[in-house]
Regions:
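Terminal connector regions
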Residues: 493-566
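Glycoside hydrolase catalytic-domain context in secreted enzymes
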Residues: 1-499, 508-517, 522, 570-1000
Length: 1000
């Protein structure tokens, strides 16, 4: 009988396989640990457990307002539709084309009709896979929709060949702009459905959609800085003009309207980026496309399209007002020449990076100054009407299609009994609003504007003044035909202040005449003020577009220049220049001088090409990634670490920021706990066992709670922020905020990366959908209302991105240059209102630099402006910082940054270890922890916690699983190796005892 052959080959293979798997698991664990923060957030994995103390107190500090998720979701679905219905702006309604007749039969055209823009892309994107579509929204109102045409647009071939193209990833590079394309279907592709048009001919409803998103600005074609970015049928490369196929569509619909197939043509503008409006005006574009009605609807959110259906059917009357100036040619905006970033021509000489995650050698200049949007178009218009010297060749009527604040209605309204009274710190505006129509009920938005004097002092000291500035607004209730409502609007006197950056170096109130007016839009406001000054259309040879109403104007005179009343903030902090280093005409790094745009010389200062700057040695030095040199290391005593004082974070509930007990609590923190919390703040704040601090979860976003980056839960997607602002309804958006807070509370989130507070500097910013408006007053007022609502549920907001992150191209480190008046009056004003009026807890700083200094390392911005002037007590988080060295840990801590939005320890956590013995940096870490902990202890993260509860750190379940897998594989490897050893030994024994082979 032959002995059993040992299985050497089998055990060799199994030993090698298990050894390889063991090594792979170990390496995988090492990689996973690098991304532990991200995995914990995405997998909802806890790193601690709570040890409950003995208490009977109610620890539900922030309570839900809904009895069930179903109740909350149903309410929010209606709320989102209401926001859209109140925010959409009716632009044109000839021949009473809208509302549609009962049971009207309509055909929907344009790829956008079946593929709406619900929101943008990037970190603010939301899941709208189950959102209703336009067809469903219309059918819910009894409108019948052409099924044949709908099915054609929805067919696989049409969706494959003619879908909107958006940049696929967040790249931040100029080249990303080339990826945008409208890609509308040509008219010939609709031929198979043409026989169905007549039956559904009550209206042809055309949807023009444009996408935007994080990491890529929209292409504008030739703009003085670059050539066409889109070729072929897309036309000039301007993404916001109609494409050749869209124009072809309109031409063919006009022909069908002319032959009686369609009764009317209605256009819906589904975009947060302002399209060029020339196609709505035959005198401008040179062709009549027969468009009867047009409505701007922005990005509609999850259920907002239902609100559009209500508007089209007449269930609701439009009452929204534009929050951007809509132009015939977007390149008429002076900001366009400096919108896309430029490279310093000598960047290579100083080894300045011009692309990637650490940009140094790219810059942008806000040369237009305060003249953003209507502040330019209406101010230059007034100067032309008044015959002011150097106003130049400017024609408002051929430049502006629809002014800021414009919004039509199905009914008409009249204003009367206008009156203004003055008190110590405010003006109270009252007037009567009457629905003068005979058929439709509706709401009216009342806007109050002021004009401040443009004085010789201003001209001598480089102060700029707009012809009109929004300073108050209100929305009536629904008024039936013939009904009236008395409206009261309070205007703070501080709205009249202006910043004098060159002489007084603080806010001043100029001497002279101030005008207040109630108006329907910014242009109407200027015409009213011109009327009060005695100007008429006839008297200006037609330079004035229409006569204003002087009865809606009130004049107030300030007898003497006042440089003291507004020279201190509400908390008593002296206000003076903080941002000279961002002004190329003042900065010690000055890369060249800039001529700011000025109404004193429009012809000589309106840009005709990008501002030219050149890098120099001092600028290059200040663009280095780390500025701190360690000389302050021993300037302070090393803080106490790891003390056993017995306090927990919950014991600080209700304590003031300056309560001395905070020092006792902070003494308990360990160095590792501080580093972990500060450097790994990606969508969370970490647990800290020494003080019983729970971990918190933070999430995007601007349109409501989302989880675009972590794949977690998402909730109601509201409309884009511009639609929210266009409601001009503070109470409504406060309710939106409360519901966003409810979503966070229900899903376990304590922080929200939003609202977005950057400005619509041009129509081409990729993230305009995340930001409210071109005007800081309406943006700040609406934002403050939303913030109040969100935070009422214990959710701390991070206003993003403070500040000047108004474009996407080269955003990671771009050098942004502007003067202080512009910074304060335009780009910081939203944060000011959101913090002082809305009580916003936190901010997220921008990727960009102020001059040479990264936002997160700008002490004057974070500590000087936000904390000292405005009194903000919460934390400052960076934008995503996992791969950027310029978002430096130590420089940021010194300047007031508290937490880095980073999921990996590669850069910042590793760097922090080098400063364990640097008392100055450890002190900055302690200060940062104070801001973080003060925020968290006042949030819903403390729900369920009492002062007697403690916390114990544990391994997250996924880490335990990996360790278990490694252990199992290691044991299997050992067993297989043992079996292999036995097999080899047996093989040798068999070889030794085998009979000798005959060698004959």
């Amino acid at each position: 009988m032959n002995p059993k052959k040992p299985k050497v080959r089998l055990w060799s293979v199994l030993t090698a396989l298990t050894a390889i798997l063991t090594i792979a698991a170990i390496v995988g664990n090492m990689i996973a640990n690098q991304y532990a923060t991200t995995l914990n957030v995405a997998l909802n994995a806890s790193t601690y457990k709570i040890i409950k103390g003995n208490t009977t107190e109610d620890t539900e500090y922030f309570k839900a307002g809904f009895a069930s998720d179903e109740e909350r979701e149903a309410y929010e679905a209606e709320l989102c539709a209401t926001v859209e219905a109140e925010g959409a702006a009716l632009l044109k309604n000839d021949n009473a084309a809208l509302p549609l007749a009962d049971s009207a039969k309509v055909s929907l055209f344009g790829h956008g009709s079946v593929d709406l823009m619900y929101g943008g892309t990037g970190s603010g994107s939301v899941d709208t896979s189950k959102a209703p579509n336009l067809k469903e929204a219309l059918e819910a109102q009894g409108i019948q929709v052409n099924q044949t045409l709908w099915d054609l647009y929805k067919s696989d071939s049409m969706m494959k060949n003619y879908s909107r193209i958006t940049p696929a990833s967040i790249s931040d590079t100029l080249e990303a702009n080339t990826q945008y394309a409208v890609n509308e279907a040509p008219w010939s592709a609709l031929s198979s459905a043409e026989s169905s048009f007549a039956e559904y001919g009550d209206a042809a409803i055309v949807v023009f959609s444009r996408s935007g998103g994080e990491g890529a600005d929209l292409p504008s074609g030739t703009n003085g800085t670059n050539d066409s970015w889109i070729s072929g049928s897309e036309g000039s490369g301007n993404y916001l003009e109609l494409s050749a196929e869209e124009i072809e569509l309109l031409k063919n619909l006009k022909a069908l309207k002319d032959n009686g197939t369609f009764k009317s043509i209605v256009v819906l503008i589904n975009s947060s980026n302002a399209l060029e409006m020339d196609f709505l005006n035959p005198a401008i574009c040179g062709e009549d496309y027969g468009i009867d009605a047009a409505m701007w609807i922005g990005d509609v959110g999850q259920t907002g399209i239902n609100g559009v259906g209500q508007l089209l059917a007449g269930t609701v009357t439009p009452s929204g007002s534009l929050v951007d100036t809509y132009l015939y040619d977007n390149l008429a905006n002076p900001a366009m020449y400096n919108f896309y970033t430029q490279a310093y021509p000598n960047a290579a000489e100083y080894n300045l990076l011009t692309e990637g995650a650490d940009v140094q050698g790219m810059y942008s200049v806000y040369q237009e100054g305060i003249y953003l949007g209507y502040r330019y178009f209406e101010t230059r218009y007034e100067d032309v009407v008044m015959g002011t010297a150097k106003a130049g060749d400017y024609d408002w009527a051929t430049t502006v299609a629809y002014p800021f604040g414009y919004g039509d209605s199905y009914t008409t309204f009249a204003y009367s009994n206008f009156n203004v009274t003055e008190s110590d710190d405010a003006f109270t505006v009252t007037l009567k609003v009457t629905n003068t129509g005979k058929t439709y009920s509706g709401k009216e938005t009342v806007q109050v504007y002021f004009q401040s004097p443009y004085t010789d002092y201003d001209k001598a000291n480089g102060i700029e003044k707009a012809a009109a500035e929004l300073c108050g607004f209100a929305k009536t209730d629904v008024l039936a035909p013939g009904a009236s409502e008395d409206v009261t609007i309070t205007v703070k006197k501080s709205e009249l202040r202006t910043y004098d950056a060159n002489n007084a170096k603080t806010y001043i109130l100029d001497a002279g005449d101030y005008y207040f007016t109630a108006a329907t839009d910014s242009h109407n406001a200027v015409n009213n003020i011109l009327a009060a000054k005695g100007y008429t259309v006839a008297g200006t040879n037609g330079r004035m577009t229409e006569d204003g109403d002087a009865s809606l104007v009130w004049k107030w005179t300030n007898e003497a220049l006042d440089a003291t009343t507004y020279a201190a903030s509400a908390n008593g902090t002296a206000i003076t220049n903080l941002f000279d280093e961002s002004d190329p005409n003042k900065s010690s790094d000055a890369p060249g001088s800039v001529t700011w745009m000025s109404r004193s010389d429009w012809t000589g200062t309106v840009p005709t090409q990008p501002a030219a700057l050149t890098a120099k040695e001092t600028l290059a030095a200040d663009l280095a990634f780390t500025q701190y040199d360690g000389t302050e290391a021993d300037s302070v005593e090393m803080p106490t670490l790891g003390a056993k004082n017995g306090l927990t974070l919950a014991s600080m509930i209700g304590k003031d920021f300056d309560d001395p007990q905070w020092e006792t609590l902070l003494d308990q923190l360990t160095f590792d706990e501080m580093v972990n919390t500060i450097t790994l703040g990606f969508h969370n704040t970490a647990a800290a066992a020494s003080i019983g601090k729970t971990a918190t979860k933070d999430e995007n976003g601007p349109q409501g709670l989302t989880a675009a980056l972590t794949g977690g839960a998402s909730a109601m997607c509201y409309t884009s922020e511009d639609v929210m602002a266009a409601t001009f309804n503070v109470d409504l958006i406060n309710e939106v905020g409360k519901c966003i807070g409810e979503d966070c509370l229900a899903m376990g989130y304590s922080g929200l990366y939003g609202p977005g507070i950057n400005m619509h500097r041009t129509a081409y910013s990729g993230r305009n959908f995340e930001y409210y408006a071109e005007d800081p007053f309406v943006a700040g007022t609406i934002c403050a209302a939303e913030v109040q609502g969100i935070q009422s549920k214990g959710v701390y907001v991070y206003l993003k991105h403070v500040a000047l992150n108004d474009s996407e191209t080269s955003r990671r480190g771009v050098n942004t240059w502007l003067n202080e008046q512009t910074a304060r009056e335009i780009y910081l004003e939203v944060a000011d209102k959101a913090i002082t009026d809305g009580g916003a807890w936190c901010v997220m700083t921008g990727f960009n630099r102020w001059g040479a200094t990264w936002c997160g390392a700008n002490a004057n911005l974070l500590n000087g402006f936000l904390r000292e002037e405005l009194g903000m007590r919460g934390m400052c988080i960076t934008d995503f910082s996992g791969s950027s060295q310029y978002m430096d840990l130590v420089d940021g801590l010194i300047a007031g940054s508290d937490i880095w939005d980073s999921p990996m320890p590669k850069i910042h956590t590793t760097k922090a270890a080098n400063y364990e013995n640097d008392a100055y940096i450890v002190t900055q870490m302690r200060n940062a922890m104070h801001h973080i902990l003060y925020t968290v202890v006042n949030s819903n993260a403390m729900n369920g916690w009492s002062a007697s509860d403690t916390l114990k750190t544990v391994l997250p379940w996924w880490q335990t699983a990996i360790y278990a897998l490694i252990a199992v594989l290691a044991v299997l490897t050992v067993l297989c190796a043992w079996q292999l050893s036995k097999a080899l030994k047996r093989k040798k024994e068999l070889a030794d005892t085998a009979p000798a082979v005959d060698q004959k």
